[in-house]
Amino acid sequence: MSLNFTVVIPARLRSTRLPGKPLLPIAGKPMVQHVWEQARRSGASRVVIATDDASILEACQAFGAEVLMTRADHESGTDRLAEVVAHLGLPADAIVVNVQGDEPLIPPVIIDQVAANLAAHPEAGIATLAEPIHEPETVFNPNAVKVVSDKNGLALTFSRAPLPWARDAFAKDRNVLPEGVPYRRHIGMYAYRVGFLQDFVSWGPCWLEQTEALEQLRALWHGVRIHVEDAIEAPAVGVDTPEDLERVRRLLEA
């Protein structure tokens, strides 16, 4: 039997790193439309875009998406997601996948994977994905979030800093990654149960989440387990910087 889940795509116009990001044109379409189209190719029963901006609302309606306006004062995309699921009236055990609005090349198969990951791990409140890192530049890039998991696949922590810090190896040479250390980049897509989202919002942000600007740290701070799997197909590139945008444009306009 196929898994029933809903995809929500948070889309904010006021991105701090790349203003106007969801509406930036790529191959004749706004970026958020590419994300929506990829999500529609997954096994999701419903795909909803959540925004706090009228221009995004109008653009999404123009290409036929289901889109909801939310409050503008949310601390994170997950807080925005909680408002959406409350509006949709989903039951507490329903699975919702949060697909970031800056992943226009997100493979539909990994949207299905993260939903199945959560369904297979009832001990976890959240499921997410990662991919191996092989380049030192990525380890030291603050836009590439690193994740370290325990032997059971549960996240120990996430950070924009190089994690783990290879003390002896990096003291000698930071241009080579030490052998035997499984560096992993977090892929910013999550599956939640609706009941967890209600708890998440009630907690409010913690100092660690605010320091790193990583909303998943709020869950770890409160003792919630996050199960992490390596993606069976990794996205080519997310869009965090103007350079990322140009790379994606070259790929989709080729």
From Swiss-Prot:
EC assignment: 2.7.7.38
Main location: cytoplasm
InterPro entries listed in its UniProt record: Cytidylyl_trans, KdsB, Nucleotide-diphossugar_trans
A GO term for molecular function: 3-deoxy-manno-octulosonate cytidylyltransferase activity
Source domain of life: Bacteria
Record bears the keyword Cytoplasm: yes
Cross-referenced Gene3D superfamilies: Spore Coat Polysaccharide Biosynthesis Protein SpsA, Chain A (3.90.550.10)
Protein keywords: Cytoplasm, Lipopolysaccharide biosynthesis, Nucleotidyltransferase, Transferase
Record pathway: Nucleotide-sugar biosynthesis; CMP-3-deoxy-D-manno-octulosonate biosynthesis; CMP-3-deoxy-D-manno-octulosonate from 3-deoxy-D-manno-octulosonate and CTP: step 1/1; Bacterial outer membrane biogenesis; lipopolysaccharide biosynthesis
PANTHER family: 3-DEOXY-MANNO-OCTULOSONATE CYTIDYLYLTRANSFERASE (PTHR42866), 3-DEOXY-MANNO-OCTULOSONATE CYTIDYLYLTRANSFERASE, MITOCHONDRIAL (PTHR42866:SF2)
Entry's family note: Belongs to the KdsB family.
Reported function: Activates KDO (a required 8-carbon sugar) for incorporation into bacterial lipopolysaccharide in Gram-negative bacteria.
Record protein name field: 3-deoxy-manno-octulosonate cytidylyltransferase
Organism: Pseudomonas putida (strain GB-1)
Lineage: Bacteria, Pseudomonadati, Pseudomonadota, Gammaproteobacteria, Pseudomonadales
